[in-house]
């Protein structure tokens, strides 16, 4: 079974949409979330390999988790953040909420005209998913949402947004999740 893990909480005092801006590292809470989820993964799941986004927050999460799992980690771009709305990057959440695209993003983000569609995100992640077994994918919220939406043929893109260091996986064609209590 392949499992998706969203990275831990990020230190972001200015509430910036950071996407791929360098330097956004895990907060103290994010570190604790990753430590907790590592214990859960070791206890309850068979993980043979870790595939992680190369972005700092995901790399840090994977390294913390791997202190307990002790598996091979591969950092690859195919599991990175959704290509998204470029003019949002570097803006505050408040500024993003004022944009014309924000309402579409909230209601039905599959209708957005962006550099990378959510379906394109699904396709790049699905290739990895189909070609691997017992892998922990450490990635980002919209990447996980895109994958689950299309893989499960859902009618609601916003059904289950993973919070920081939550797990999501598919079992018998059904979404299963573990909500990190930290």
Task: Locate predicted features.
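Generic structural signal for well-ordered alpha-helical scaffold segments
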Residues: 35-42, 122-133
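Domain-level recognition of soluble alpha/beta enzyme cores
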Residues: 154-181
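Active-site-proximal alpha-helix that buttresses catalytic centers in soluble enzyme cores
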Residues: 2-72, 165
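Short glycine/proline-enriched coil/turn segments at helix->beta-strand junctions
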Residues: 43-46, 67-72, 130-135, 153, ...
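Phosphate-handling substructures
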Residues: 25, 67-124
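Active-site signature of alpha/beta-hydrolase-fold catalytic machinery across serine-
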Residues: 64, 146, 150
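Short, active-site-adjacent cap segments at secondary-structure transitions
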Residues: 57-59, 82-83, 143-145
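Generic beta-sheet signal
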Residues: 2, 131-142
């Amino acid at each position: 079974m392949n499992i998706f893990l969203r990275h831990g909480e990020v230190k972001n005092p200015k509430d910036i949409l950071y996407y791929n801006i360098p330097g956004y590292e895990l907060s103290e809470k994010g570190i604790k979330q990753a430590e907790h989820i590592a214990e859960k993964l070791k206890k309850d799941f068979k993980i043979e390999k870790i595939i992680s986004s190369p972005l700092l927050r995901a790399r840090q999460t994977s390294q913390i988790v791997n202190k307990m799992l002790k598996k091979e980690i591969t950092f690859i771009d195919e599991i990175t953040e959704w290509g998204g709305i470029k003019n949002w990057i570097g803006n505050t959440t408040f500024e993003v909420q004022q944009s014309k695209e924000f309402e579409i993003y909230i209601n039905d983000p599959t209708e957005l005209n962006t550099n990378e569609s959510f379906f394109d995100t699904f396709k790049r992640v699905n290739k990895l998913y189909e070609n691997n077994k017992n892998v922990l994918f450490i990635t980002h919220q919209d990447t996980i949402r895109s994958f689950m939406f299309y893989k499960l043929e859902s009618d609601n893109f916003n059904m289950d947004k993973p919070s920081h260091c939550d797990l999501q996986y598919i079992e018998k064609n059904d979404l299963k999740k573990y909500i990190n209590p930290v």
